[in-house]
Design a protein with these regions (language model features):
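PLP-dependent amino-acid enzyme catalytic core
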Residues: 1-254
Length: 254
């Protein structure tokens, strides 16, 4: 198998470890990133576990194409998309949205008016959108979705998210028409929160991480910290004034 990610990618490390456990070779194409102690340790573990590691010049689609072509010339195998991003992987996020609705119905939390999520490669967001549409058939009752893009634009875009959403519908319903309320994805915002770049802590994210740690939550700087920074900037005063419930959807941790 071959997959792609940043040097500190949990997905790349997990691919290498699990491939080795079942007797498969694991070939990683890794892009450079600024490092924290955690990402540096993750990178070292991936180097030790993988069959081969190709260092890409930068997080650039041209560099990726060259690295992938070189791998295909040498070997035959299965390519796992960047971050494992695919329709099958999005199923769990759709189910997560149904769990959220069940918790609301059980009175465990108030109906959320907004939901924030970090977007790295798009499949988590696509699955969440489909799940929210299924869980809240009335679009007026659905939480608005704000995605914080934490990777370069070519890795996650509205078009990519919508494409995975279509693939997920095809996976779940096949040739049958899905229910009308899930036929089209709910509206969503995809806003940049990359800051200095992928893996590099942002000022807003670090401020939000400090606040979160004070109330008992440890957020990673690459995904959750930047997402929380966006939430903090947009919702801090609004939530106080309107008393509205907001969900921060967790997708990464150290």
């Amino acid at each position: 198998v071959c997959t792609v990610g940043g040097e500190g990618s949990h997905h790349a490390l997990a691919t290498a470890l699990h491939a080795r456990a079942v007797g498969l070779e694991a070939h990683l194409l890794l892009t450079p990133q600024p490092h924290t102690a955690h990402s540096r340790a993750t990178h070292a573990a991936a180097l030790a576990a993988a069959t081969s590691v190709t260092a890409l010049a930068a997080s650039d689609p041209r560099s990726f194409a060259v690295g992938l072509a070189a791998w295909r010339e040498r070997r035959r195998g299965y390519l796992i998309p960047t971050g494992g991003s695919c329709a099958l992987g999005a199923v769990g996020m759709a189910e997560g949205a149904l769990e959220l609705r069940a918790q609301v119905d059980a009175g465990l939390l108030p109906p959320p008016r907004a939901l924030y999520i970090a977007a790295g490669s798009g499949s988590s967001l696509a699955g969440l959108l489909l799940g929210l549409a299924a869980a809240w058939p009335d679009p007026r009752a659905r939480p608005e979705v704000i995605a914080a893009r934490v990777t370069p634009r070519h890795l996650v875009s509205r078009g990519r998210v919508l494409r995975i959403h279509e693939e997920l519908k095809a996976l779940l319903w096949g040739e049958e028409a899905p229910p009308p309320h899930v036929a089209a994805p709910p509206p969503f915002e995809l806003l940049s929160a990359t800051g200095p770049g992928y893996g590099a802590p942002s000022a807003a994210g670090e401020e939000a991480r400090g606040w979160a740690e004070g109330v008992g939550f440890k957020l990673d700087p690459s995904y959750m910290g930047k997402m929380m920074g966006l939430l903090w900037a947009r919702e801090r005063e609004r939530a106080r004034e309107e008393g509205r419930a907001v969900v921060a959807w967790g997708t990464g941790a150290e």
